[in-house]
Curated annotation (Swiss-Prot):
Signal peptide: none
Superkingdom per UniProt: Bacteria
Lineage, opening ranks: Bacteria, Pseudomonadati, Pseudomonadota, Gammaproteobacteria, Lysobacterales
Entries under HAMAP family matching the protein: PIMT (MF_00090)
Main location: cytoplasm
Protein name listed in UniProt: Protein-L-isoaspartate O-methyltransferase
Entry annotation: catalytic residues: 75
EC number: 2.1.1.77
One Gene Ontology biological process: protein modification process
Gene Ontology CC terms: cytoplasm
Organism from which the protein derives: Xylella fastidiosa (strain Temecula1 / ATCC 700964)
Similarity comment text for this entry: Belongs to the methyltransferase superfamily. L-isoaspartyl/D-aspartyl protein methyltransferase family.
CDD domains: AdoMet_MTases (cd02440)
Subcellular location: Cytoplasm
Amino acid sequence: MTAPPSLQAKAVGIGMTSQRVRDRLVERLRECGIQDERVLSTIRIVPRHLFIDEALALRAYEDTALPIGHGQTISQPWVVARMTEAVMQVVPKKILEIGTGSGYQSAILASLGLEVYTIERIGKLLRQARKRFRQLGIKIRSKHDDGSTGWTEHAPYNAILVTAAAPTLIDTLIEQLAIGGRLVAPVGTASEQALVQLTRTIDGSITHEILEPVTFVSLLPGMLD
């Protein structure tokens, strides 16, 4: 896996954003059970500090979620790695992400060589994410919309990744999943959630597996500018 040249150039940091600090994060993720070396290498390369407010840059490589405004967060690196590892098991080519947020998860997926489609309901967050994609030379297709409806024009997808929690899995998204594809999403209430993995098998049937307890912001309907 080779990152785009502009991403490699931007990835260089100093102090608490240095490569040494990122290496420590990757080792922590490995110790916490992340095994896919493609995912670990990508997390090592993609500059998380560029996806958060400059005031929080010193905390960019802590294994913790951080606020990005509008009541949203950039997910904990372990959660990003776990969800990415789960979808990579089906060797996807095209993936739909629901909830662009800062754009960090999108950048991880694109840097793994996937064709990424991402939807964000908050216009300001999407504009900021698009600016980061351009700065890093990452090609990602994005739109401002209600993510719960998916993106039917480009369906089916080999993988769908949802970055906000709904009370149940959304049928509209499941319908856009290709045969052999996988959907990974947090499911539950604000007080109790689990990361769920859904796979559409070769005969078209659906299997479910609960992966981990997690905490995500809620998946909300509608759009904001």
